[in-house]
């Protein structure tokens, strides 16, 4: 079945196929022209046509893949977070404020952090740093009004940098993750003459859920036990420094799927907070850590790729449960802090890539001896008469030669006699017949052409079974794997390990869909393959059709026309976790805004060149060219090439060194 522009296929059909209205969160939709729209402020009247944008960038000689960063989405996510907490604070009459501190580790790119610091400063938000490089960046980019929370393991130099910033009047809070860090803080504070402001991270009994549940609980990597926390507070009080402990921090996971875990954690942490106040700590802040989820699959569930709550519900629970515990204890409400990096950054980045080609899996071409009036039969039965129950009229077709082995004849009989009523029996018989053919072939008793005929007949049966099964209300378990088995592999110009590492490492789902041709009905079940030389470089789990699917519906490729796909919600962790597998480097990155309905390209960050990625692994251009020159001179001396060809060879290598690491799809 080909993909055609059909009035029966609508924009609504495309939206349901790719679930864009479920995971798009108001930022992504489909236009009347069948292209993907991006609405950074969730205002449909202020939208960017993704296909038009990519075409414009192509006119600037910017090849795909390209990572598009929409600054407006970053700003909108920060404002929405602020609005939700302000609503909760107002509704519950909470007597303090809220701040988000963005963990730089989520997306360390300077342009991204600058956008967040700029918008965050207006809202009173801050930065979380988990290493010395991140702290240096945070202090340099922020001002005195930007709070900086320092997490992670720390050495003397890390702590000295933090306390020196405190001495400058900066609001920097080093958080004690293990007991020895408090010793360092006290020593450095005494050395530089600062009365330190300190936070402590506690290990809660409450654990998160899903793949990040190990971030919380007694066995978590970071934090102090409650016993250690109290012992260190007693130590500070004995030194007349109880007022220095001002922040309590906990963390139950990077993505909290079930709101119940958050409620339990807040209640537990709030109880600890009020007890610290009673014991003499100068508490001011309750840092609830990360975990505010992102609904990658649009299911609004507690699955690992979703969340069963809204941002407003999250804010309400944090405020309400903290307030309730503090009011019961007669303790002032703390200033609330969250480290909601994933929720802020995920939506703003979109990776666009071009399809390079397709490999069909389980080709259903029938053997050459199956003909109708001299023409080979196609697997969709075009031009073939069917009887009243759907079987093929065999009088028009030739069967296998008599010399062919019996299992091949069995496959042929099953194919031509298959109906809705006997399709399961035929399918099972076909599996047995194919196994017999493979055994005969391995034993040297089945010629290669008969093996090809058997495989073609088997896949033709599978295609026909899948076609007949589409009318069934409930597909039998034996047939549920057919879409996956018969799916095409669409090869796209990207590296999974560079641009979507979480898809490979932890089976993270990311929405993927074409950015154009969405008014055409897609007809191909597909999985995606990248261009690395690694069998793991594939995507075979997708957000579509109302849930997680093993294949993605795509359109047949058209000769001479590009077919472009986008991966959405890759703004959190993917860029910084990406690696140089096969030396595919960073993609081009483009920062985009919209003003009065006009798309503005704010900046273009060119992707890595071949020379740059070779430099990362200690190769030098000069040395490589010198080595090549030696080979060229040897080839000239041996008469393999002339001087003109030598110049062409060296020039080609020099061009390659300055070129993009990804494949070129431009025609020369």
Swiss-Prot record:
Positions carrying N6-(pyridoxal phosphate)lysine: 105
Top-rank lineage group of the source organism: Bacteria
Binding site for substrate: 286-296
Endoplasmic reticulum recorded as keyword: no
GO MF term list: arginine decarboxylase activity; metal ion binding
Pfam family, one: Arg_decarbox_C
Enzyme Commission number(s) of this protein: 4.1.1.19
SUPFAM superfamilies given in the database record: Alanine racemase C-terminal domain-like, PLP-binding barrel
Catalytic activity: L-arginine + H(+) = agmatine + CO2
CDD domains, A to Z: PLPDE_III_ADC
S-adenosyl-L-methionine as UniProt keyword: no
Name of the featured protein: Biosynthetic arginine decarboxylase
The protein's role, per its UniProt record: Catalyzes the biosynthesis of agmatine from arginine.
Family label: Belongs to the Orn/Lys/Arg decarboxylase class-II family. SpeA subfamily.
Organism annotation: Rhodopirellula baltica (strain DSM 10527 / NCIMB 13988 / SH1)
PROSITE patterns for the chain: ODR_DC_2_1 (PS00878), ODR_DC_2_2 (PS00879)
């Amino acid at each position: 079945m080909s993909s055609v522009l059909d009035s029966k296929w609508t924009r609504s059909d495309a939206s349901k196929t790719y679930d864009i209205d479920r995971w798009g969160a108001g930022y992504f939709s489909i236009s009347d022209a069948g292209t993907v729209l991006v609405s950074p402020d969730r205002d449909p009247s202020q939208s960017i046509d993704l296909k038009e944008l990519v075409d414009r960038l192509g006119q600037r000689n910017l090849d795909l893949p390209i990572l598009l960063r929409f600054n407006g989405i970053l700003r909108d996510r920060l404002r929405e977070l602020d609005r939700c907490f302000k609503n909760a604070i107002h509704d519950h009459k909470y007597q303090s404020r809220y701040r988000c501190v963005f963990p730089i580790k989520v997306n360390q790119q300077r342009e991204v952090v600058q956008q967040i610091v700029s918008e965050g400063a207006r809202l009173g938000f801050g930065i979380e740093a988990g290493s010395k490089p991140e702290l240096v960046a945070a202090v340099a980019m922020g001002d005195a009004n930007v709070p900086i929370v320092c997490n992670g393991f720390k050495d003397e130099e890390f702590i000295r940098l933090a306390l020196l910033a405190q001495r400058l009047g900066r609001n920097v809070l080093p958080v004690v993750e293990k007991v020895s860090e408090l010793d360092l803080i006290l020593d450095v504070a005494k050395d530089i003459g600062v009365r330190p402001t300190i936070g402590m991270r506690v290990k809660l009994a409450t654990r998160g859920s899903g793949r990040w549940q190990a971030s919380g609980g007694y066995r978590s990597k970071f934090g102090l036990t409650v016993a250690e926390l109290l012992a260190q507070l007693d130590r500070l009080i004995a030194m007349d420094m109880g007022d220095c402990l001002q922040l309590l921090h906990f963390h139950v996971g990077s993505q909290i799927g079930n709101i119940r875990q958050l409620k339990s954690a807040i209640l537990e942490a709030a109880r600890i907070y009020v007890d610290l106040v009673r014991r003499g700590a100068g508490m001011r802040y309750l840092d609830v850590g990360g975990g505010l989820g992102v609904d990658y699959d649009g299911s609004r569930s507690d699955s690992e790729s979703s969340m069963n709550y809204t941002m407003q519900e999250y804010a309400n629970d944090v405020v309400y449960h903290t307030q309730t515990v503090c009011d019961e204890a007669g303790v002032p409400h703390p200033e609330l802090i969250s480290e909601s990096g994933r929720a802020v950054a995920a939506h703003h980045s979109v990776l666009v890539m071009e399809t390079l080609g397709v490999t069909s899996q389980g080709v259903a071409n029938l053997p050459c001896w199956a003909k109708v009036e001299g023409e080979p039969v196609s697997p969709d039965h075009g031009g073939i008469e069917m009887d009243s129950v759907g079987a093929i009229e065999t009088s028009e077709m030739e069967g296998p030669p008599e010399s062919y082995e019996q299992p091949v004849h069995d496959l042929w009989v099953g194919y031509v006699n298959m109906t809705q009523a006997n399709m399961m029996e035929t399918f099972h018989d076909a599996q047995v017949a194919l196994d017999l053919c493979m055994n005969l072939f391995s034993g040297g008793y089945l010629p290669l052409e008969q093996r090809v005929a058997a495989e073609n007949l088997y896949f033709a049966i599978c295609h026909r079974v899948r076609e007949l099964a589409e009318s069934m209300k409930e597909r039998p378990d034996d047939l549920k794997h057919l879409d996956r088995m018969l799916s095409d592999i669409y090869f796209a110009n990207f590296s999974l390990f560079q641009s979507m590492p979480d898809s490979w490492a932890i089976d993270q789902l990311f929405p993927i869909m074409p950015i154009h041709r969405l008014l055409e009905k897609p007809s191909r079940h597909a999985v995606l393959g990248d261009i690395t030389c690694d069998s793991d470089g594939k995507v075979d789990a997708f957000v579509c059709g109302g849930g997680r699917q093993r294949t993605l519906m795509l359109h047949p490729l058209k000769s001479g026309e590009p077919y472009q796909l986008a991966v959405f919600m890759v703004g959190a962790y993917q860029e910084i976790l990406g690696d140089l597998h096969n030396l595919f480097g960073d993609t081009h990155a483009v920062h985009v805004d919209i003003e009065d309905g006009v798309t503005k390209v704010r900046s273009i960050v060119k992707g890595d060149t071949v020379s740059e990625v070779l430099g990362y692994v200690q190769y030098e251009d000069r040395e490589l060219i010198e080595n090549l020159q030696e080979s060229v001179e040897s080839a000239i001396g041996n008469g393999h090439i002339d001087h003109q060809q030598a110049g062409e060879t060296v020039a080609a290598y020099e061009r390659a060194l300055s070129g993009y690491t990804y494949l070129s799809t431009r025609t020369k």
